[in-house]
Structure formats: C-alpha cells, structure tokens
Amino acid sequence: MELAVTRTSNQGGDLRRPGRGLTLAIVELTLTTAYIHLTLGGILFTLNAVGYSALAAAMVIVAVDRHPLVQRFDWLPRIGLLAYASTTIAAYLVVGPYFSLGWVAKAIEVAILTLLVADIHRVYGSPGGLLRDALASVGLGKRQMRTA
C-alpha cells in the first residue's frame, strides 16, 4: 500500500514558496566564503569558516522548519549573518593582508549583505518591520502578520 504525501503551503520544505531562490543564493554564497576561509589555514580563518557555516545552517533551518519557536526567532540568523559579514569585511580592511583571493571573498560577502537586505525587505517589508518582529519575539511589542 502506498501513501501519498502532500505538502501544504504552511509546511517547510516547499520549494515553490517565494524567496527560496534568494535564501538558496545567500546560503550558497555563505558556504563559498566559508570554504575560502577554511582553505587559508590558521585558527582565525578556520573559526571564521565555522562561523559562516553555522550561520548558513541557521538560514536553512529558518527557511525549512515551520516550528513556532524557529519562526519566532527567524530574524536572528539574518541579523547575525549581516553583522558577521560586515565585521569580517571591516576586519579585512583594517588588518589585511590584501591579496586577490581576499578581495574575492570580500566581494562575495558584499553580495551576501546585498541579498540579506533584499531578503529583509521581502520578509519584513522594511528594517523597521524586522525591528518590530525582533522586539515582539522577546515580548516587547506585537508581531506583524506576514504572508511569506
């Protein structure tokens, strides 16, 4: 006997949902820069690669898992990755060393930042919408209704 499994629109894993391509691009670019940092060797680059990998995994979990706790804090990986990539870019500009692969990694990180801003506008409508959801998730306001 075969059982047919169908997904409804409110379950995770539906690849037709809006924004899946955007999330996929963010995750792919994040894993790419993680790989670049991992191949450079040294503890600092290795830890940077681990951080990027963890944030990529968090983005996937938020995109796929419809658990209420995950959805309550779905803003956290976006802000975390935004801050992490920004800090990595700033540290590179201050410390160096400047070489071609480093600039490639920074270009990828700028692309990550750009896609994250687009994702924040897609999901929350504006940075203010993200702030409202973040505050509401810790009990300091009312969460806005979203269709995505």
Enumerate the predicted regions with their spans.
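Membrane-interface extramembranous regions
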Residues: 2-148
